[in-house]
C-alpha cells in the first residue's frame, strides 16, 4: 500500500498525528523537489522512529513503476511538502498505482492554497492560479491576470523554482518580469510575501525594497470588498 503524507508548510513539527502514526509502520521516503522544506530530516526520523530515504524527481517520474512495485509487497509512505495533491506529479503517481492495483491513501496537510486566508482576501474570489516562470513563456500568466481582472477576481502567482539545485525565484525577480511584460505598473498595490512570515501589501515600487524570504508568492487583487480592503490596510 502507498501512503502519501503531507508535511505542511513549516518544518517536521507540522506532520499530523495521523501521518506520524501511519509512518511508524511503513518504509518511508521523502521528496523535496516540489518546494523548499524548512524542516530537518533527522528530526523527522526521530519523530516517526523510522529511517527516511530521499527521492528525486526522476525517481518518481522515470522510475515510477520501480518505486510502485515496492508498494505491492509492503506499506510505503511518501512524505510530500505541503499537501500531497497540490502537485501534478503525485496525481500521476496515484493514477499509475491504481492501474497496478495498489491501494493509495492520502493524508492531507496545509498548502499555499489552504493558507491563503492569511492574505485577508475572500477565498471564493480567487481566479486561475499560475506560476511566473524563469523562462520568457508568459502566455499563461498574461491570460490569467487579464481574465481574472475582467471578472474582478484575485490572481495568485506562484514563483518558479528548481529545488533540486536550490534555485528559487525571488519576489524582486518576479516583479521585474511582470513589469517588463507590462502586466503590472510600479504604482499598483499588490500583495507579496512568504506565508507564515513577512507579508506586505504595498506599491510595486516599494516592494522592491522589501527583503522577502523564499519560497514566496504574489497576489494581484481584483475588485476588493470593503472588509478585504480594511484587512489589507490595517493588518498587512
What are these regions (language model features)?
Residues 65-70, 145-146, 206-210:
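Short amphipathic alpha-helix with an adjacent loop that forms part of the alpha/beta core around
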Residues 1-3, 27-28, 52, 75-78, ...:
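Structural motif
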Residues 2-4, 148-236:
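A contiguous loop/helix-start segment that scaffolds small-molecule binding in enzyme catalytic cores
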Residues 1-103:
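Class I S-adenosyl-L-methionine
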Residues 82-155:
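Class I SAM-dependent methyltransferase SAM-binding "motif I" and its flanking Rossmann-like core
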Residues 8-10, 33-36, 56-60, 110-112, ...:
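Short, acidic/turn-prone active-site loops that include or flank metal/cofactor-
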Residues 55-57, 107, 192-194:
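Conserved beta-strand termini and adjacent loop/short-helix elements that scaffold enzyme active sites
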